[in-house]
Structures are given as C-alpha cells and as structure tokens.
C-alpha cells in the first residue's frame, strides 16, 4: 500500500496580464501634444499629420488639437490625424 497519495500535475494555471490596448481618444475629441491616441499591436491605425508612431506602434499626438480618423488610399488604411485648432 502506498503511504503517500499520488499527486497529479497540471499544465494549466497561468494567465498573462491585460495589455489595455485600443483607442484612447476618439474622433472629434481635443488632445494635448504627447497624449496617447491608440495603443495597438502592429499598425491597425496609421499615423497622419500631427501624429507620431512609437516603438510599440502606439500613436500619440505631436501637436495640440482635435483628433480625426479617416480611411485613405486603395488599401483603405485607417489613418489618425491631429488637426491644430486655430
């Protein structure tokens, strides 16, 4: 007779932390320079005028203004721009 109960092992029991991706500032909203507009994996949204592209493909405002989303070109690329308010 065994004196210890046989202990099984599981290959589950792990989970990754949430990455909080997505659009942070929507079209028509005011934004300050340096603020994040979109956090993404890859370029689902492409930078337009007044928008910078970070090392992890994060889009951020280069100027103060209003956010504009548009679809451009034959490839129907979704572009994000920041239009400076006069």
UniProtKB/Swiss-Prot annotation:
Keywords: Ribonucleoprotein, Ribosomal protein
Coiled-coil regions listed in the entry: none
One Pfam short name: Ribosomal_L27
InterPro entries reported in the protein's UniProt record: Ribosomal_bL27, Ribosomal_bL27_CS
Alphabetical GO biological process terms: translation
Family statement drawn from the similarity comment of this UniProt entry: Belongs to the bacterial ribosomal protein bL27 family.
PANTHER family the record matches: LARGE RIBOSOMAL SUBUNIT PROTEIN BL27M, RIBOSOMAL PROTEIN L27
Protein name: Large ribosomal subunit protein bL27
Species lineage: Bacteria, Pseudomonadati, Pseudomonadota, Gammaproteobacteria, Lysobacterales
């Amino acid at each position: 007779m065994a004196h210890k109960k046989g202990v099984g092992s599981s290959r589950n029991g792990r989970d990754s932390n949430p990455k909080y991706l997505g659009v942070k500032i929507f079209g028509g909203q005011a934004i300050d320079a340096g603020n994040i507009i979109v956090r993404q994996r890859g370029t689902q949204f492409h930078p337009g005028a007044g928008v910078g592209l970070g090392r992890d493909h994060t889009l951020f405002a280069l100027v103060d203004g209003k956010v504009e989303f548009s679809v451009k070109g034959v490839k129907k690329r979704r572009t994000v721009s920041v239009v400076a308010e006069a």
